């Protein structure tokens, strides 16, 4: 899906790591949320409360999910899931466009 209809967009940006990662929150009529954002090259660690699906729209990175020793390469058009109450590390190699879905 390349666009979302009938949504509310929160104007204030979510800014992490001194602007290295930014996003905007989108709220659907069902109450579900996604964020659309950009990551600049760098290394980042995020914690999750609920499970998340990270769709990489463009860019190039490696991800390591907590409890898994190996790093997984992820490129534009690919995705990865992170379980609830976990964390993940990313080595972002190029400017990366992403959509994060917060799973129920």
Curated annotation (Swiss-Prot):
Q: What reaction is this protein's catalytic activity? A: a purine D-ribonucleoside + phosphate = a purine nucleobase + alpha-D-ribose 1-phosphate; adenosine + phosphate = alpha-D-ribose 1-phosphate + adenine; cytidine + phosphate = cytosine + alpha-D-ribose 1-phosphate; guanosine + phosphate = alpha-D-ribose 1-phosphate + guanine
Q: Which InterPro entries match?
A: Ppnp (IPR009664), RmlC-like_jellyroll (IPR014710), RmlC_Cupin_sf (IPR011051)
The terms under GO molecular function for this entry are: guanosine phosphorylase activity; purine-nucleoside phosphorylase activity; thymidine phosphorylase activity; uridine phosphorylase activity
Identify the domain of life. Answer: Bacteria
Q: Which keywords describe this protein according to UniProt? A: Glycosyltransferase, Transferase
Signal peptide residue numbers: none
Enzyme Commission numbers on file: 2.4.2.1, 2.4.2.2
EC class of the enzyme, as a word: transferase
One GO cellular component assignment for this chain's record is: cytosol
- Keyword field contains Transferase: yes
Q: Which HAMAP family match?
A: Nucleos_phosphorylase_PpnP
Q: What does this protein do?
A: Catalyzes the phosphorolysis of diverse nucleosides, yielding D-ribose 1-phosphate and the respective free bases. Can use uridine, adenosine, guanosine, cytidine, thymidine, inosine and xanthosine as substrates. Also catalyzes the reverse reactions.
Q: Which family does it belong to?
A: Belongs to the nucleoside phosphorylase PpnP family.
The protein's name is: Pyrimidine/purine nucleoside phosphorylase
